[in-house]
Amino acid sequence: MRLEAEEWREISYRHIKGRKRFRQRLFCGERISADDLNYNRPRVCPACLNERPIWWAVWDLGLVTACPIHGCLLFNRRPACRRKLAWQRLAIHQCRCGLDFRDLTIESADPDLVAINTAIYRAAGFPHGNAAELALANCGFPAQLLGLRLGPLLRLVLFVGP
């Protein structure tokens, strides 16, 4: 990608400067904790990659484990050998071993998991689809939860748990 320095800064997860803000990052314009990011292993939605081979930043959030657009679980391991996906790959959609993630069979996610991931996508400003919005409405989350900004929503989901 040929981006100017300012463009790179805009898409990076920058530290937020200031007193007691060392552990905060800027994620797509929203303040989140550094702990909210998934540094260990990448996750992908094969169906999303099949439609458009781009990396969605929302997949970098640690609590995002399902794709609300396709109602499926994200992959973080290769199905055959169960090895972790690597950050360094031949292409966004291709494993170092040559496996094309777009060819993987998707696994349906639990509707409640889809609903909470829809809330996260929405708070992060990412598209999530009409079906996901309907699943979110049927889940019965309080309006106050759905009105939270991304950082507080991630904290609440983390502390309340499943």
Per-segment meaning from a language model:
Residues 1-162:
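C-terminal accessory regions
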